[in-house]
């Protein structure tokens, strides 16, 4: 996964983690530089573990603050609730993730098209024969 957008995400996350004095696991970067299946498996496992940990911590924060998830989203989308440094770091992560998501969607679409060509490309279109509408038999116009 030698993607520029993936590296941007890593750099953005490192920046946010540095603001809050949280250590970044360097094994993520080394897994991204290799294309072996074992490294991808390791990366997926570690990512899932981190997501579960973050979900648990997010739930704890929601419980402590008494906010709903929707209220927390509104809070998180308001730049007045963060220092300029924190807000810039968050915006950088958001834009990096959006770029990565778009790149991944495009890649998935390309792979899907390669594996499953559209039905139109398999079968040539048939010409529709134009048929004149016949008058009904025994029709008496008024």
Curated annotation (Swiss-Prot):
Q: The organism sits in which domain of life?
A: Bacteria
Map out region (Disordered) in residue numbers.
115-142
Compositionally biased spans, kind Basic residues = 124-142
> Belongs to which family?
Belongs to the chlamydial CPn_0742/CT_635/TC_0003 family.
- Protein known as: Protein CPn_0742/CP_0003/CPj0742/CpB0770
């Amino acid at each position: 996964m030698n993607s520029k957008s993936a590296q941007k995400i890593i750099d953005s996350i490192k920046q946010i983690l540095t603001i809050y004095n949280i250590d970044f696991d360097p094994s993520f970067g080394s897994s991204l530089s290799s294309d072996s299946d074992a490294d991808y498996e390791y990366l997926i496992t570690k990512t899932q573990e981190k997501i579960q940990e973050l979900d648990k911590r997010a739930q704890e924060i929601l419980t402590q603050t008494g906010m709903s998830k929707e209220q927390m989203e509104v809070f998180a989308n308001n730049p007045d609730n963060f220092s300029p440094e924190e807000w810039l770091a968050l915006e950088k992560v958001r834009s990096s993730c959006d770029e990565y998501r778009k790149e991944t969607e495009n890649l998935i679409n390309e792979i899907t098209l390669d594996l499953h060509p559209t039905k139109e490309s398999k079968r040539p279109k048939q010409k529709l024969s134009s048929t004149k509408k016949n008058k009904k038999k025994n029709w008496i116009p008024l």
